[in-house]
From Swiss-Prot:
A lipid is attached at residues 204, 206 (S-geranylgeranyl cysteine). This is Ras-related protein Rab7. It is a lipid-anchor. GO terms for molecular function: GTP binding; GTPase activity. GO terms for biological process: protein transport. InterPro entries: P-loop_NTPase, Small_GTP-bd, Small_GTPase. It comes from the Eukaryota. Belongs to the small GTPase superfamily. Rab family. GO terms for cellular component: plasma membrane; vacuolar membrane. Keywords: Cell membrane, GTP-binding, Lipoprotein, Membrane, Methylation, Nucleotide-binding, Prenylation, Protein transport, Transport.
Amino acid sequence: MSLRRRTLLKVIVLGDSGVGKTSLMNQYVHKKFSQQYKATIGADFVTKELQIDDRLVTLQIWDTAGQERFQSLGVAFYRGADCCVLVYDVNVMKSFDTLENWHEEFLKQANPPDPRAFPFILLGNKIDIDGGNSRVVSEKKAKDWCAAKGNIPYFETSAKEDYNVDAAFLCIAKAALANEHEQDIYFQGIPEAAVPENEQRSGCAC
């Protein structure tokens, strides 16, 4: 029997309350979207398995509260992260303006060995609202911010319409895999069928 490698990757999703962090995660993992908004209290996580090349990857995606009073919980949740996903609402300028704070807070609390090399990914969510007519943060403005942070990847997404969600999280998985802390578990003889068909590599390059 051959040995297959399964890797656990910890991904932290940050951003203001109401930008759609939970909705993006639910769309990616469960293929579900709800119009009802319920604020995340503290932090919670979901998992998703996928295959990248010869690696069986388990993404542990942490959904953290956007409210300021819960930010002190960050230390325990940020530590050991392999990738940080920053999310803002393209229709709310304040959610974009606070990205700098989220970025700095993560680096401060997570304290990665090389902050400049740690993988971040930016998602501009809710591009479906009002057919895009109500957006206030331009794509150029977002890309300029990413360029200033070392050319971090940027995706425009819609959790409601399931637009770019899979592509974004595949890029997230690849970035996290490149930064992994070698938390590998070996399983003997895991068949290909163990990875659900809809979670196979899509072929999208990050």
